[in-house]
């Protein structure tokens, strides 16, 4: 038993967990619960534009075509709800959307401002439109529009969306219910 636990620990990929095969989505992509694909190679550039879903899809697919990325290879993110963490510069908390909160609320001290803004880590909660999984287009659309009213500096190029951990509603580990699977947290990697 101890050997199996150690074996599982060392054979586990840092960024993936395979729980259960769920079948395929409407496009024939295999769907696994709890298996998180890499989201590298998507040539998206974040900007200040707030898109409708139709406008975003048009711009997104034009971007993929321009960079010879096959949209059929884009993986789904199989979770009904996720938290996404990213860094940005804000002038005030009023820039946060209702689905967002600061990682450390106490970091907004006046003396910490640089050029009238605070550099903060933000968590955004997203729910899949179909209640089961996010398409790549859907999650990037939601992330893009959430970040559009914030300053990203020169880090505007999408590099990856990486699984980080699970967050639980309880404040103490003893308070976590055995049935609470938590909400997966992903980090947006941006480059310049």
What are the roles of these predicted feature ranges?
Residues 13-15, 24:
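Intrinsically disordered, low-complexity N-terminal tails
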Residues 1-12:
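Polybasic, Ser/Thr-rich amphipathic helices
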Residues 17, 27-64, 70-74, 78-80, ...:
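Ubiquitin system architectures
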Residues 116-138:
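Short, contiguous acidic and Ser/Thr-rich linear segments
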Residues 93, 112-114, 118:
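The transition from N-terminal targeting/processing segments to the mature protein
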């Amino acid at each position: 038993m101890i050997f199996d636990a150690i074996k599982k620990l060392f054979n586990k990929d840092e960024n993936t967990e395979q729980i259960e095969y769920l079948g395929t989505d409407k496009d024939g992509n295999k769907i696994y619960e709890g298996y998180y694909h890499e989201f590298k190679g998507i040539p998206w550039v974040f900007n200040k534009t707030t898109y409708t879903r139709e406008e975003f899809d048009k711009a997104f697919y034009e971007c993929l075509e321009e960079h010879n990325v096959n949209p059929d290879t884009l993986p789904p993110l199989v979770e009904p709800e996720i938290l996404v963490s990213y860094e940005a510069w804000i002038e005030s908390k009023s820039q946060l959307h209702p689905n967002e909160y600061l990682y450390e609320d106490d970091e907004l001290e006046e003396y910490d401002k640089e050029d009238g803004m605070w550099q903060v880590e933000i968590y955004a909660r997203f729910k899949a439109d179909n209640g089961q999984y996010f398409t790549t287009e859907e999650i990037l659309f939601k992330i893009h529009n959430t970040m559009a009213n914030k300053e990203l500096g020169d880090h505007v190029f999408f590099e990856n969306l990486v699984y980080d951990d699970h967050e639980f509603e309880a404040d103490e580990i003893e308070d976590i219910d055995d049935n609470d699977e938590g909400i997966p947290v992903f980090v947006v990697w941006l480059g310049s």
